[in-house]
């Protein structure tokens, strides 16, 4: 459902999609929504990602030309970043200029990565503005879906449940590595 405050649509409580923020007021509205990380897909705005960083957001910049789709390797790297950001509890916005085709392509690939399969992903995107908008984008999703496969061991989900607190492990590791270096 679109947020009235910043014109983003929340896919989950940690993942939103929308158009490129084109003013400091829109960036402030994103902050007030709790968004702290942005995946910027805009190739047409060469400095927008820097403005977003300066505004205090963590930014993953993957420039994709309008009406095109990312290369499979770039898509995989972007989805790995997105998985990590969501796992770490960050609220992430995925955007291109208008929040439609490129945004929808990456979102659809993320749904497939989370195990939803083409049918469930299609149902999730059905009433959303963000979805692949042309043949190249749909073809990329089809290829990605074949590569990724479908989850059969557990129920697919977009929610990150049972997050693991790594702090005790990291503290032990720091202590051990300190002893080894001495």
List the predicted regions and their residue ranges:
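Conserved G/P- and acidic residue-centered "switch" motifs that form tight phosphate/ATP-binding loops
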Residues: 99
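Ser/Thr-glycine-rich phosphate-binding loops at phosphate-binding pockets of nucleotides
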Residues: 103
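Cysteine-based protein phosphatase catalytic domain of the PTP/DSP
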Residues: 4-91, 112-114, 118-139
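Secreted peptidase-domain scaffold signal
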Residues: 180-182
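Cysteine-dependent PTP/DSP-like catalytic domain, specifically the C-terminal lobe
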Residues: 88, 106-171
């Amino acid at each position: 459902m679109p947020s009235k405050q910043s014109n983003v649509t929340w896919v989950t409580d940690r993942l939103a999609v929308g158009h490129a923020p084109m003013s400091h007021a829109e960036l402030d509205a994103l902050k007030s929504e709790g968004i702290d990380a942005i995946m910027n897909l805009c190739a047409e705005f060469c400095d927008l990602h820097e403005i977003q960083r300066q505004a205090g957001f963590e930014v993953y910049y993957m420039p994709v030309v309008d009406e095109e789709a990312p290369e499979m390797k770039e898509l995989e790297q972007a989805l790995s970043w997105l998985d990590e950001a969501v796992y770490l509890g960050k609220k992430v916005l995925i955007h291109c200029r208008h929040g439609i085709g490129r945004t929808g392509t990456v979102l659809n690939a993320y749904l497939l990565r989370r195990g939803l399969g083409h049918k469930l992903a299609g149902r999730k995107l059905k009433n959303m503005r963000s979805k692949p908008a042309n043949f190249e984008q749909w073809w990329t999703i089809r290829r990605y879906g074949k590569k990724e496969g479908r989850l059969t061991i557990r129920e697919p989900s977009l929610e990150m449940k049972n997050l693991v607190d790594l702090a005790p492990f990291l503290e032990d590791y720091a202590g051990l590595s300190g002893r080894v270096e001495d």
